[in-house]
UniProtKB/Swiss-Prot annotation:
One of its GO terms (molecular function) is [isocitrate dehydrogenase (NADP+)] kinase activity. Belongs to the AceK family. It comes from Pseudomonas fluorescens (strain ATCC BAA-477 / NRRL B-23932 / Pf-5). This is Isocitrate dehydrogenase kinase/phosphatase. It catalyses: L-seryl-[isocitrate dehydrogenase] + ATP = O-phospho-L-seryl-[isocitrate dehydrogenase] + ADP + H(+). Its EC number is 2.7.11.5, 3.1.3.-. Its main location: cytoplasm. GO terms for cellular component: cytoplasm. The active site is at D373. Signal peptide: none annotated. It is found in: Cytoplasm. InterPro entries: AceK_kinase, AceK_regulatory, Isocitrate_DH_AceK. Bifunctional enzyme which can phosphorylate or dephosphorylate isocitrate dehydrogenase (IDH) on a specific serine residue. This is a regulatory mechanism which enables bacteria to bypass the Krebs cycle via the glyoxylate shunt in response to the source of carbon. When bacteria are grown on glucose, IDH is fully active and unphosphorylated, but when grown on acetate or ethanol, the activity of IDH declines drastically concomitant with its phosphorylation. GO terms for biological process: glucose metabolic process; glyoxylate cycle; tricarboxylic acid cycle.
């Protein structure tokens, strides 16, 4: 290999691009505190979308600078890129965000070269970062009550102050102490070794701020999340205290927008979260704080490790076959893989470009805990032996432009991944009476909360919603979604004549964006009992005026409250 080849210069320019991205990422993230203090909710939504789009923008800029700075002959000689990787490793070894910089390098490589040139020699398919890092400055604050919970809580909130005052801190602290004693066994509150540990930085998302940490003794630990709200005109309010692991897991769910939080050493913060949420994969934790590209890297590493270490094979996902997407899964890996079919059902008035646009839209909007996050992949390559023959046959039949067999390898040219859930229609088939009621209640709430966040699902059939392991109903089929304000909700006109009333087809004109909520009941529910129950629970969804009222509120700039936790115990009635 030629010593004059500019490996070190290319590596430095890639890292300079990463530094530029990180600086802009930090600027947006650091503004979250001020947006919370000043109740700038619409600005918070815009900042969230801007931060998501930032990564691809900066990758594009860096790739363009590389093309400008180096000749095509030098830059595009892939055989020399192991030298670039080696030079890059030496540049990132002392960084506090070294694992993120590896993912950035991978993105630049993929922006330059086709995916069939991917190899661990040229990029970081496997990380070079040590699993155990050097000790660094503490990112947490620790408190020991030593029998005085009230005094400890006073100290906590003396440390976590904002430019806006707490509305009623003494009252909040009394309620907080009472809730803590109610949530934990009595012996824990009296344990002299009881310790409360909180991450030093506050996490921000939508209208909330969150203190995140844990409570522990020598024998046991509990996660701890304290959400704060800014009540405009009243001040900051402590809204809840959460110590249940399942409830904390929901706060960090794949259905939520990404937190904004200052994390000087990302790997250490993820390790901290992993201690309090051991059931969460680190891919999901990185994604939850906005590092979704690195979450994607960790997901891919987990996937290839699973395939290499198990006999699992891809099968078609259970449920009704999609009219636009074909969905397959690995039984032992909690994910579904979705590809766009070459031909859609005639009833679907969309094309491939529109479907891609809709799925990418979901990434940038507030999912309010009711839409599954997705990761988009290009040129997945899997061993042929890892596919059930029936699964592969179906994929090749419905999407031959996307799926191809190359020798002993299956190429998936484009797909999305989502968390696997139980389709709501299948869940209801096996649910008892109480479970049916609970699921339909949550199904209606999901539709309402999405609508209040300016999202209209379009196709609201039960099969397009899933039930998570925590029992929450989540929307996951996005080919017909639109902003609620784009839909035209109408009442069905009264018939003009007896002939109108008996007509098999609508006698009135219907525009492309028209929606008639009165038509929902028979469309959504084949089961008459479920239809009647849903009418009792959420009958207003059948009224066009309900939807129009939401549209008016959204156009007036109202940002709704959708809380990722049960609000009980702290706020006075």
């Amino acid at each position: 290999m030629s010593q004059s080849w500019p490996a070190a210069d290319i590596a430095r320019m890639i890292l300079d691009g990463f530094d530029d991205y990180r600086e802009h990422f930090r600027q947006i993230t650091d503004g979250a505190r001020q947006r919370f203090e000043q109740a700038q909710w619409q600005q918070a939504q815009k900042a969230s979308a801007a931060r998501i789009n930032l990564y691809e923008e900066k990758v594009g800029e860096t790739v363009a600078r590389l093309h400008q700075a180096f000749s095509t002959e030098s830059l595009m000689d892939v055989s020399q890129w192991p030298l670039v990787k080696s030079a890059y490793i030496s540049l990132i070894d002392l960084r506090f965000d070294d694992e993120l910089s590896e993912t950035w390098y991978n993105s630049i490589f993929c922006g330059l070269f086709s995916h069939d040139l991917i190899s661990d020699g040229c990029m970081f398919i496997h990380t070079t970062r040590p699993s155990l890092r050097r000790a660094r400055a503490a990112q947490t604050r620790s408190y020991k009550p030593q029998g005085e919970l009230a005094t400890m809580l006073e100290q906590v909130f003396a440390d976590y102050r904002f430019s806006e005052d707490y509305a009623d801190l003494p009252g909040d602290l009394r309620r907080l102490e009472a809730q803590l004693r109610e949530n934990l066994p009595d012996w824990v509150c009296k344990d002299p070794e009881l310790t409360l540990e909180l991450f030093s930085s506050v996490l921000y998302r939508n209208k909330g701020a969150y203190l995140v940490g844990r409570i522990f003794t020598h024998e046991e630990q509990w996660p701890l999340v304290i959400p704060l709200l800014h009540r405009e005109g009243r001040g900051i309010q402590i809204d809840a205290l959460i110590t249940d692991e399942a409830d904390v897991s929901i706060i960090f769910s794949f259905t939520r927008s990404y937190f904004m939080v200052d994390v000087p050493v990302p790997a250490e913060f993820i390790g901290f979260l992993k201690r309090i949420l051991p059931g969460k994969h680190i891919a999901e934790l990185y994604t939850s704080i906005g590092f979704y590209k690195h979450g994607k890297s960790e997901f891919y590493r987990a996937l290839i490790n699973h395939l290499a270490s198990t006999d699992d094979r891809f099968i078609m996902a259970p449920g009704v076959r999609g009219m636009v997407m074909s969905v397959f899964t690995l039984p032992g890996f909690n994910t579904v893989f979705k590809i766009i079919k070459d031909r859609f059902s005639p009833s679907k008035n969309v094309d491939r470009a529109t479907v891609i646009e809709k799925y990418r839209l979901v990434k940038s909007v507030d999912r309010v805990g009711r839409m599954a996050d997705t990761q988009e992949f290009a040129d997945f390559r899997f061993p042929l032996s890892k596919f059930d023959p029936a699964c592969l046959e179906e994929l090749l039949e419905v999407a031959p432009s996307t799926v191809a067999v190359e020798g002993q390898t299956v190429l998936i040219r484009h797909c999305w991944t989502e968390r696997r859930m139980t389709p709501l229609n299948l869940y209801l088939e096996h649910a008892n009476e109480a479970q049916v009621r609970e699921a339909l209640e949550d199904y209606g709430l999901a539709i309402k909360q999405l609508a209040a966040a300016n999202i209209f699902p379009g196709d609201m059939l039960l099969k397009n919603f899933g039930v998570t392991r925590h029992g929450r109903v989540v929307f996951y089929d996005y080919d017909e979604i639109c902003f609620l304000t784009e839909a035209n909700f109408r009442h069905i006109p009264a018939p003009r004549t007896p002939e109108d009333e008996m007509a098999s087809e609508p006698w009135y004109s219907i525009g492309p964006h028209d929606v008639f909520p009165e038509e929902f009941p028979p469309f959504l529910f084949a089961d008459a009992g479920q239809r009647k129950l849903f009418d009792q629970l959420h009958g207003e969804l059948y009224n066009a005026d309900y939807w129009k009222g939401l549209q008016e509120a959204i156009r007036a700039g109202k940002v709704i409250d959708v809380f990722p936790y049960r609000r009980q115990g702290l706020e006075d009635e």
